């Protein structure tokens, strides 16, 4: 997910960067068909990944479960591996364990906690102001204006404990060995989720785009979450669109450790680079900052493959 912040100039991509991404998986791709206009569709994105030696990606929609789409793409583009996911916004019933259960039965690999309907993310988005909004915020305002937008969602109660609906969703995630991704919830919610996931038997937890403004986790917080068992995700769009400095993201990766980090693009927006190119630009940035080829492969190939296949 990205707002309409002015992006930087594209980074020239070397053969070395493409080589480092051979066999890579992007765990957060926003392509079409979708409620929001996208730069590319599922099929063409899978073909572009294969053409560059990358393996596949996870389809993220803020609104709809993507398990069925993923199965069709994987069959239609031989050699690709595309996976589905679900995001627990109001369009799927919010923190709805039935939706999680059926996503698991459909082969979905990631369950994102609320994003566009997260109380942490929607604060100030739906009540006017701010001419520059994320694409999704415009849709949320339209739904609110039509009187069909329920209250924002939180995974914790006033005492900071996971709510019963959140716990029930985590139980379904554990049952199907899916990846719990923290979405756009706030700092206290992220820590509650990571701790609760361990208690409820969830084996794979991904802290979503750690530097994104609505999360804005410090290096110390990211390391603490990794110490609790989470993998920390860093997304290309966050830094490319100037929501966080590259140097901060690189420092956070070094502090947490490459072995507990994944890189994703969060791409697919019409105004941003193509998904495959953005992934390679991210790899190039890391290489230019002194990370090794092996480091990039760990974050783009080894850990994503393990998360998807275990």
Listing of model-derived features with the role each one plays in the protein:
Residues 235, 258-275:
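Short acidic/histidine-rich active-site segments
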């Amino acid at each position: 997910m990205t707002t309409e912040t002015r992006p930087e100039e594209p980074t020239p991509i070397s053969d070395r960067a493409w080589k480092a991404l051979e066999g890579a998986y992007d765990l957060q791709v926003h392509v079409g068909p979708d409620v929001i206009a996208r730069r590319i569709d599922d099929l063409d994105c899978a073909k572009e990944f294969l053409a560059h030696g990358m393996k596949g990606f996870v389809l993220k929609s803020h609104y709809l479960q993507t398990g069925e789409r993923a199965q069709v793409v994987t069959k239609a583009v031989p050699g690709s591996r595309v996976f589905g996911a679900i995001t627990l916004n109001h369009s799927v019933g919010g923190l709805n364990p039935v939706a999680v259960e059926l996503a698991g039965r459909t082969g979905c690999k990631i369950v994102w906690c609320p994003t566009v309907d997260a109380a942490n993310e929607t604060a100030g988005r739906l009540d006017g102001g701010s001419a520059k909004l994320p694409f999704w915020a415009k849709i949320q305002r339209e739904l609110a204006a039509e009187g069909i937008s329920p209250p924002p969602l939180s995974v914790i109660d006033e005492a900071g404990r996971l709510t019963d609906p959140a716990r029930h969703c985590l139980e379904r995630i554990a049952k199907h060995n899916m990846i719990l991704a923290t979405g756009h919830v706030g700092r206290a919610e992220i820590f509650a989720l990571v701790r609760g996931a361990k208690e409820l038997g969830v084996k794979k937890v991904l802290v979503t785009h750690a530097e994104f403004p609505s999360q804005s986790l410090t290096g110390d917080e990211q390391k603490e979450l990794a110490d609790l068992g989470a993998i920390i995700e860093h997304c290309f769009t966050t830094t490319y669109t100037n929501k966080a400095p590259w140097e901060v993201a690189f420092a956070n990766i070094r502090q947490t450790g490459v072995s507990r980090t994944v890189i994703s693009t969060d791409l697919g927006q019409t105004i941003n680079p193509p998904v495959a190119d953005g992934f390679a630009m991210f790899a190039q940035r890391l290489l230019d900052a002194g990370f090794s080829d092996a480091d990039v492969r760990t974050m783009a190939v080894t850990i994503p493959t393990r998360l998807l296949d275990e």
